[in-house]
């Protein structure tokens, strides 16, 4: 690595706005929240996955416009699908909302330069849309839980 490139990274680090620091912090913590939801449901940690997801989350916080966020979401979702066998657990919407927040915040951080601030109108719009997505996610989970717990007699026509 040449010194000019390193100096560019240092200048970018120093020029990062406070708002971008908060966005990057959420980018690191949200997928860890999804892993915590899996741990809370299953009762055991996945140490290797914790390291992998932490590294991927940190990489996506540093470069939010890269594909590392996709890989982190895929690892978290695959871990959930492999280890959890219940659809009626309240940890499912918690993990889903964590991954939704991760995606939304990472995309928002990638939209603006590191030294820039997100305009309030844009921030409110993104927050409103993310909250709508989260509420639809939780609503769909509630519908699945209600249908899963329903005791309906068999029907040959269905």
Task: Show which residues each predicted segment covers.
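Membrane-interface helix-boundary motifs at transmembrane edges
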Residues: 59, 118-122
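Generic detector of solvent-exposed, compositionally biased contiguous segments
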Residues: 36-43, 51-59
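Small-residue-rich segments of transmembrane alpha-helices in multi-pass membrane proteins
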Residues: 74-87, 124-135
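Transmembrane helix interruption/hinge and helix-loop junction motifs
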Residues: 40-47, 62-66, 83-89
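Alpha-helical transmembrane segments and their cytosolic membrane-interface
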Residues: 1-46, 93-105, 115-118, 128-133, ...
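Alpha-helical transmembrane segments and their membrane-interface exit regions
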Residues: 52-62, 78-83, 97-107
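Membrane-helix interface "capping/anchor" motifs
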Residues: 58-72
